[in-house]
């Protein structure tokens, strides 16, 4: 056999043996976590988690229901399992990413129609894809210094949503967006930015009186309203009765109590230039910090911080500091399917943060702030462009 043929045969054998790792297919096969492995990971996590009701049960007794998220949110990127006794576990589909991405000790996971949750999950996918460029499994953090802080909003039973009665004073939709069903005659959603902010305000039960009015004009690109559409909130005249602004609503409350929360939501939404519609949005963090101080009289310590300005360790230290001072954090990111705002109000001491999504408690639980492998962050552990342009508003106190 001549040298040329021998070389060809050797290359073929190496390829068949899976040693040509430049081929991403072979690399993914080496690190992929299949469905059985993912389910086993979820069961093991449940058994080791004393906080989850099923924790003391045998593997055979733990019943899991796989959640089909569809598209890139499933399969090779992540698996989500609801626990029959309450709670859920999110497992990454690749061993170059953290094994467990999120969990809850109660309720169930549901991202349908909830854009802030879907967007956050999408950011996980983008980070998992980045990790797939690596040739090393996820090693985790050598030393975890995160404090344990029980959910601050849960401690007061605060679980707001975006529909009735929270949106009874938001603008009424006037037009049909081409290609969509009609929402004409319905009140716009409060928006995740306003809902997150209002939940933090309810936690502090502040202010008793508004400080400064606010007005703005809806963007002419908004397809749900006739233009120009000017919105005004007489915040300076408001007397916020926190006894009537309840921690949560079931629909059986008095009209006074319903109007109290809807007035707060409308004031907050207008103060952050809400882009109203069936799914309302806002630029978020920069406007939230301004509104809290200028319109609602919060402490001048309120300010925005950006993920890209910190290492991973320093960023999480900023969040930990707020939680240790019993101050819920307004948190925001931007992903492929839009922005997402929510409240971080707790920590479990294992690098998971408690998230209140603002959907009446649905899908609330403990989540990692990112799914990145430290090896993907490089020197200094900065954001690396894969943290969804995350920002937070901290120092929120009366």
UniProtKB/Swiss-Prot annotation:
GO cellular component: cytosol; extracellular region; host cell cytosol; host extracellular space
Keyword Lipoprotein among record annotations: no
Induction: Expression is regulated by the CovR-CovS two-component regulatory system.
Summary of activators and inhibitors of this protein: Synthesized as an inactive zymogen to protect the intracellular components of the bacteria from proteolytic activity during protein production. Once secreted into the extracellular milieu, cleaved into the active protease: maturation can be mediated in cis by autocatalytic cleavage, or in trans by mature SpeB or host proteases. Protease activity is strongly inhibited by zinc and copper, which prevent its maturation into an active protease: inhibition by metal ions may be required to prevent proteolysis of streptococcal proteins.
Outcome (variant: residue 192 to S): Abolished cysteine protease activity and ability to undergo autocatalytic cleavage. Abolished ability to cleave host GSDMA
Keywords from the named record: Autocatalytic cleavage, Host cytoplasm, Hydrolase, Methylation, Protease, Secreted, Signal, Thiol protease, Toxin, Virulence, Zymogen
UniProt xrefs under InterPro entries: Papain-like_cys_pep_sf, Peptidase_C10, Spi_Prtas-inh, Streptopain_sf
A biological process term (GO) from this entry: protein maturation
Catalytic residues identified in the record: 192 (nucleophile), 340 (proton acceptor)
E.C. no: 3.4.22.10
Modified residues (Cysteine methyl disulfide): 192
Catalyzed reactions: Preferential cleavage with hydrophobic residues at P2, P1 and P1'
Signal peptide: 1-27
Proregion residues excised on maturation: 28-145
Cellular location(s): Secreted; Host extracellular space; Host cytoplasm
Region: C-terminal active site loop, residue numbers: 368-390
Residues the record lists as binding a protein: 282, 339
Gene Ontology molecular function terms on file: cysteine-type endopeptidase activity; toxin activity
Family membership noted in the UniProt record: Belongs to the peptidase C10 family.
Domain comment quoted from the record: The C-terminal active site loop is required for the recognition and recruitment of substrates and release of hydrolyzed products.
Function: Cysteine protease that acts as a key streptococcal virulence factor by cleaving host proteins involved in immune response. Triggers inflammation by mediating cleavage of host proteins, which can both promote host pathogenesis by triggering sterile inflammation and/or restrict streptococcal infection, depending on host immune statue and infection site. Cleaves host gasdermin-A (GSDMA) in epithelial cells, promoting GSDMA activation and formation of gasdermin pores, triggering pyroptosis.
Quaternary structure and partners: Monomer.
Protein name: Streptopain
Source species of the chain: Streptococcus pyogenes serotype M1
Upper classification of the organism: Bacteria, Bacillati, Bacillota, Bacilli, Lactobacillales
